[in-house]
């Protein structure tokens, strides 16, 4: 068997681990109806992991493609969550927390882009 045939399994297992980490972080951070700190934190953590992983891969090309796929697509994909971002956005909108909504979207999208840009330019 070719090792490429095992890539989906590695992605699947790593995504389960990423989802578990996301869940554990959400139980660790105090829940607040005013602001979804847990979602923001795991998305920032996912950005950090993905940028670190990609930069590391580009610097050290000896890393296995399967490992990169498992960690990038699997773990980081399971850790970060666009659907929770949207759900939290709708919850803030429905409850009339407009200032929190604007801040959340600015921090999530703008902050995420700035974090990715900063980490991408940083010399490790």
Curated annotation (Swiss-Prot):
Task performed by this protein: Fluoride-specific ion channel. Important for reducing fluoride concentration in the cell, thus reducing its toxicity.
Entry membrane topology: Multi-pass membrane protein
Catalytic reaction annotation: fluoride(in) = fluoride(out)
Pfam family, one: CRCB
Protein name: Fluoride-specific ion channel FluC 2
HAMAP family in the record: FluC
Keywords from the UniProt entry: Cell membrane, Ion channel, Ion transport, Membrane, Metal-binding, Sodium, Transmembrane, Transmembrane helix, Transport
Family to which this protein belongs: Belongs to the fluoride channel Fluc/FEX (TC 1.A.43) family.
Entry keyword annotation includes RNA-binding: no
UniProt: Na(+) binding residues: 77, 80
GO molecular-function term, one example from the UniProt record: metal ion binding
Localisation: Cell membrane
Gene: fluC2
Principal subcellular localization: membrane
KW Transmembrane helix (keyword) present: yes
One of the protein's GO biological processes: cellular detoxification of fluoride
Regulation: Na(+) is not transported, but it plays an essential structural role and its presence is essential for fluoride channel function.
Gene Ontology cellular component terms for the protein in this record: plasma membrane
Organism: Streptococcus pneumoniae serotype 4 (strain ATCC BAA-334 / TIGR4)
Transmembrane segments: 9-29, 34-54, 67-87, 99-119
């Amino acid at each position: 068997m070719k090792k490429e045939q095992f890539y989906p399994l590695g992605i699947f297992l790593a995504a389960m681990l990423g989802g578990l980490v996301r869940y554990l972080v959400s139980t660790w951070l105090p829940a607040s109806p005013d602001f979804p700190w847990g979602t923001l934190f795991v998305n920032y953590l996912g950005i950090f992991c993905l940028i670190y992983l990609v930069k590391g891969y580009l610097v050290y090309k000896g890393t296995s493609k399967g490992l990169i796929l498992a960690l990038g697509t699997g773990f980081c994909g399971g850790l970060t969550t666009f659907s929770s971002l949207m759900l939290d956005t709708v919850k803030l909108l429905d409850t009339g927390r407009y200032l929190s909504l604007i801040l959340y979207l600015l921090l999530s999208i703008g902050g995420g882009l700035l974090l990715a840009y900063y980490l991408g330019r940083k010399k490790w």
